[in-house]
Structure formats: C-alpha cells, structure tokens
Amino acid sequence: MARCRRHSRSRSRSRNQCQRRRRRRYNRRRTYRRSRRHSRRRRGRRRGCSRRRYSRRGRRRY
C-alpha cells in the first residue's frame, strides 16, 4: 500500500492525503497480512495503483 501511495502522489495531492487519513483506521498488522497475500498478483502489474482501478465490489470492471 505504501508503494501504491507513492505512485498516486504525482497525480493528485488531495486524494493522497485522504488515503493516508483512511489508512490509520485499519490495524497495521491486518493491512500487512493482506498485502502479503495479494503481493503475487500485484507484482505482475506495472502501472500505478491497483486500488484505483478496481473497486472493492467489482474486480473485473476494467
């Protein structure tokens, strides 16, 4: 997630702050575990942040 945030910084700063604020709500351990689980899928994707493309409900929208 940290890597994701770094890419989005150049696009829009206000949105980046919003994401940072939202991150505090989650447990750090929980986000770490989740990112480890999905790391294999993310490695193949080169363009920016996967969170921006896919919403939580619809993964195959794009």
From Swiss-Prot:
Entry GO terms, CC: nucleosome; nucleus
A single BP term in Gene Ontology: cell differentiation
Region (Disordered): 1-62
Compartment(s) of residence: Nucleus; Chromosome
Tissue specificity field: Testis.
Alphabetized UniProt keyword annotations: Chromosome, Developmental protein, Differentiation, DNA condensation, DNA-binding, Nucleosome core, Nucleus, Spermatogenesis
Record function comment: Protamines substitute for histones in the chromatin of sperm during the haploid phase of spermatogenesis. They compact sperm DNA into a highly condensed, stable and inactive complex.
Family membership noted in the UniProt record: Belongs to the protamine P1 family.
Protein name per the record: Sperm protamine P1
Gene: PRM1
